[in-house]
Each structure stands twice: as structure tokens, then as C-alpha cells.
Amino acid sequence: MLSNELETCLNSAFQVAREGKHEFLTVEHLLLAILDTPRVKEVLKACGGDVPRLAAELREHIEQSTPRLPDGDEREVQPTLGFQRVLQRAVFHVQSSGRKEVGVANVLVAIFSEKQSHAVFLLNRQDVARLDVVIYISHGMSKIADERGETKAALVTRYSRDHQHPLMCTLEET
């Protein structure tokens, strides 16, 4: 059900939290873990994100804001409700779309539903929006301009007859 890549990321997030003696495993831990994957890097760059800066800001937030277990306390790291909801949303979305495997891109989209999380705040601060991520994952349409200064979305609009429906082209184009 979970892709190998996602399982590796989840293990990495738990390991980081355990080594840091963090009491909780948060949405920020999860986003930081999936940032290391090629797919998430590609998606965020296409949506205008600065991955190294985002990673640094997440690390800083985790270090400053995550409660730590006292020395000698051997309790296991506990995932927050937000962390659990993100994974549940990703699984539900994949199941409802008839697919079998949950990947890191599904988790990235699900993170945006945790609107009160610092992870979403940092993504939004870089003007990375859920819609941009979904459009890129679904259609490969980047919000970053090509060498001519046009985005794929702008090209679709320019070449559509009514500037809203890309499948309705003018006669000259057919």
C-alpha cells in the first residue's frame, strides 16, 4: 500500500525524531523527510519552491518548537494527530482514485490540508500552493516560466479559443 520510497521517508522521519529526543513526530518532520526524494524536489521546484531553504526552515522550526523528552525517558516518539491525518488523507485519496500505492507526492498534497501547520505556512510563504502541486502532479504543468518566459498554463490559455477551455481550439490550429 505504501511505496518503498514513502516507507523509507517515514522511517527517516521517526529516526530524526528519535535521535533528537523529540516527544512528537510532526507534519514538519514528515515534510522534511519527503523533501529528500527526487519526486518531491521536482514538484516543489516546478511550483516555485526553494527546496534547500525550505529544508533549513523546517529544521530550524523542528529544533525550536518540538518538545524534547527528558534524559533517561525511554518513551517512544508519538506521531501527532496532524501527522496521522496527513497519512490517512493520502491513503484515502489513493484508494478512492482506484490506485494501489501511496507515494510521496500523495503525502505532499495531503500535507496542504493541515492548514494550521508550520509546514503549510512555510510552503505558502514560498508561494507554493496545493493547486499548483496538484496541477503539476496531474498534468506536468509548471508555474515556472520556460526560456521564453511562458508557463505551460499560459500557453494553453493563449492557444485556446475562449481562453478558458484548452480543448476548444480555433480552426487555424486544427
Language-model features: locations:
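Histone-fold recognition with a strong bias for associated Lys/Arg-rich disordered tails
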Residues: M1-T174
